UniProtKB/Swiss-Prot annotation:
One Pfam family recorded for the sequence: MeMO_Hyd_G
InterPro entries on file: Me_mOase_g, Me_mOase_g_dom1, Me_mOase_g_dom2, Me_mOase_sf_g, MethMoxGammaMmoZ
GO molecular function: methane monooxygenase [NAD(P)H] activity
Function comment: Responsible for the initial oxygenation of methane to methanol in methanotrophs. It also catalyzes the monohydroxylation of a variety of unactivated alkenes, alicyclic, aromatic and heterocyclic compounds.
Keywords: Monooxygenase, NADP, One-carbon metabolism, Oxidoreductase
Record text on subunit structure and interactions: M.trichosporium has two forms of methane monooxygenase, a soluble and a membrane-bound type. The soluble type consists of four components (A to D): protein A, comprising three chains, in an alpha-2, beta-2, gamma-2 configuration, is a nonheme iron protein containing an unusual mu-hydroxo bridge structure at its active site and interacts with both oxygen and methane.
Enzymatic reactions: methane + NADH + O2 + H(+) = methanol + NAD(+) + H2O; methane + NADPH + O2 + H(+) = methanol + NADP(+) + H2O
GO biological process: methane metabolic process; one-carbon metabolic process
UniProt superkingdom: Bacteria
Name recorded for this polypeptide: Methane monooxygenase component A gamma chain
E.C. code: 1.14.13.25
Length: 169
């Protein structure tokens, strides 16, 4: 193991490492990482309190869940189930159905982000996650790009996040 450098020590990391050390079951660690990702990652995060350290903390939780998963789950479950206990095919089918039922590109974008927060490995086996993520991304791109060129310029300017620049000669 690499020597820990003092520059990386801080009270936030120490506090979270103590919380992570208390995780003893796959169910507990899965809920912990899902709650963490919903609260501290993505554009929809609920808090920026640990913005500098959230990736380090997420990595440590992922490590803990991975260890618990390999210690406590049957080998067959490692490649056929999510750590939530759900069957991989059911997860894939559920989320693809959700995004296909989306009424707008914004709703579809939210569904895709939520899937990533809840199922990013080690919660879901990597091969299943990547395949499902690609399928969701494909549907999202199709929704986003439907008749893009048919949208009037004024309609495009009203899209969330658009900033109109005026060039001066």
């Amino acid at each position: 193991m690499a020597k820990r450098e003092p520059i990386h020590d801080n009270s936030i990391r120490t506090e979270w490492e103590a919380k992570i050390a208390k995780l003893t079951s796959v169910d507990q660690a899965t809920k912990f990482i899902q709650d963490f990702r919903l609260a501290y990652t993505s554009p929809f995060r609920k808090s920026y309190d640990i913005d500098v350290d959230y990736q380090y903390i997420e990595r440590k939780i992922e490590e803990k869940l991975s260890v618990l998963k390999t210690e406590k789950l049957p080998v067959a479950d490692l490649i056929t189930k999510a750590t939530t206990g759900e069957d991989r095919a059911a997860v894939e089918a559920t989320w693809i159905a959700k995004i296909k039922a989306a009424k707008s590109k914004y709703e579809a974008d939210g569904i895709h982000i939520e899937f990533r927060q809840l199922y990013k490995p080690p919660v879901l086996p990597v091969n299943v996650f990547l395949r499902t993520d690609a399928a969701l991304g494909t549907v999202l791109m199709e929704i986003r790009n439907t008749d893009y060129y048919g949208t009037p310029l004024e309609g495009l300017r009203k899209e969330p996040g658009v900033k109109v620049l005026h060039l001066q000669a």
